[in-house]
């Protein structure tokens, strides 16, 4: 049995986990910074770095203690090297290097996007429903929206990506525009079932070049224009006041300050994003002859996306991660390192953080 310590600090979560044999999560600890950044309406890179510095030592210590693991029990230390906020990446990477140097345990650098893919592979293998290859991976989060062909040897081919906003970024920006605070995506998801997803018709421009690419900036602008045309200042102010007085309103509180027209708008926006994601994912899967569809990243938490994917009767298995492994975590980083460990692909202590690291 081999254990890997994973460390993740690419954005605004400080995370550590111990995974055994690529499928057993012995511990997974995540320190969120949501309360820190929420008042600013988004992630502030400088604050994120400082919060990582405060959290990294206790988070790693807790992951080791929960799993009853000593450093000398580890086969490797895996750490996110990119993509992400460079200041945040440096905190986790520097600490992982220090542990590796002090303990003599080998270091493995991991691509954050690859980690999201392996979050699904880990759980599918553990649950006895392994992913069949080639697989089509849709990775959708606040910072990424990509389509990859995933081969059995864990090599990748990029098929499509966003040309502007990521899907999760579009959710959060629209949520902020409507007064739902940060992050706004989960609030839209909670309210969407109470609206009509066909009430507001959104159209997407035909993509020039790669038809599998995404673009969400036009949709975001269309929502802005709709808001400007419907005199929504008072209700938006009411929602902002609600968030100011209570950072975590319940559903009834949201519904009390959100008229039917805005519920329809939220439902229609979510429906449009989901349609774009699944339409391009299905086209990509058909192109490569996929035997599985992997949906991962923070947007994989969206209940509407999950329901639509499972209801679409695709001719291959659809795999989502559990909610705990959808958002940023370190178990996925450790899981992604196991194939590299098997190939003895260790990283040197000179490995650098890469804010714009690509997977393929």
UniProtKB/Swiss-Prot annotation:
Pfam family, one: TsaD
Keyword Transferase: yes
GO process terms (BP): tRNA threonylcarbamoyladenosine modification
Coiled-coil intervals, chain numbering: none
Entry's localization field: Cytoplasm
Catalysed reaction equations from the record: L-threonylcarbamoyladenylate + adenosine(37) in tRNA = N(6)-L-threonylcarbamoyladenosine(37) in tRNA + AMP + H(+)
Top EC class, one word: transferase
InterPro entries reported in the protein's UniProt record: ATPase_NBD, Gcp-like_dom, KAE1/TsaD, TsaD
Positions annotated to bind Fe cation: 112, 116, 328
A GO cellular component entry from the record: cytoplasm
EC nos: 2.3.1.234
Annotated S-S bridges: none
Keywords for the protein's UniProt record, in alphabetical order: Acyltransferase, Cytoplasm, Iron, Metal-binding, Transferase, tRNA processing
Task of the protein: Required for the formation of a threonylcarbamoyl group on adenosine at position 37 (t(6)A37) in tRNAs that read codons beginning with adenine. Is involved in the transfer of the threonylcarbamoyl moiety of threonylcarbamoyl-AMP (TC-AMP) to the N6 group of A37, together with TsaE and TsaB. TsaD likely plays a direct catalytic role in this reaction.
Family as reported in the entry's similarity comment: Belongs to the KAE1 / TsaD family.
HAMAP family listed in its UniProt record: TsaD
NCBIfam families reported for this sequence: gcp_kae1 (TIGR00329), T6A_TsaD_YgjD (TIGR03723)
Protein name according to UniProt: tRNA N6-adenosine threonylcarbamoyltransferase
Provenance organism: Solibacter usitatus (strain Ellin6076)
Lineage: Bacteria, Pseudomonadati, Acidobacteriota, Terriglobia, Bryobacterales
